[in-house]
């Protein structure tokens, strides 16, 4: 029984190391680091308007999303 448990533990450890070393779980779509706010308060536009404001303020490479959030509505800019 202990021999089987050790084998399973070893295989699980190898799989974890494989996934970590090849960055299989790393997503290019991850966009959750807060960059800053943009536009007036309260922000009356849509998410598309918010993204356009963020790109105009912070430029395109760092900005990956703009979302209208909060009460009152704010335009929040995010980078990956």
Swiss-Prot record:
GO CC annotation terms, alphabetical: extracellular region
Disulfide bonding pattern of the chain: 38-64, 50-75, 54-77
Signal peptide start and end residues: 1-29
Location in the cell: Secreted
Presence of keyword Kinase: no
Entry's Gene Ontology BP terms: defense response to fungus; killing of cells of another organism
Keywords: Antimicrobial, Disulfide bond, Fungicide, Plant defense, Secreted, Signal
Family the UniProt entry places it in: Belongs to the DEFL family.
Protein name: Defensin-like protein 207
Organism in which the protein naturally occurs: Arabidopsis thaliana
């Amino acid at each position: 029984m202990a021999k089987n448990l050790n084998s399973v533990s070893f295989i699980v450890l190898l799989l974890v190391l494989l996934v970590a070393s090849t960055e299989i779980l790393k997503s290019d779509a991850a966009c959750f680091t807060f960059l800053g706010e943009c536009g007036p308060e309260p922000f009356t536009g849509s998410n598309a308007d918010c993204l356009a404001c963020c790109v105009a303020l912070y430029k395109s490479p760092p900005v990956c999303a703009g979302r209208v959030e909060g009460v009152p509505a704010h335009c929040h800019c995010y980078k990956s």
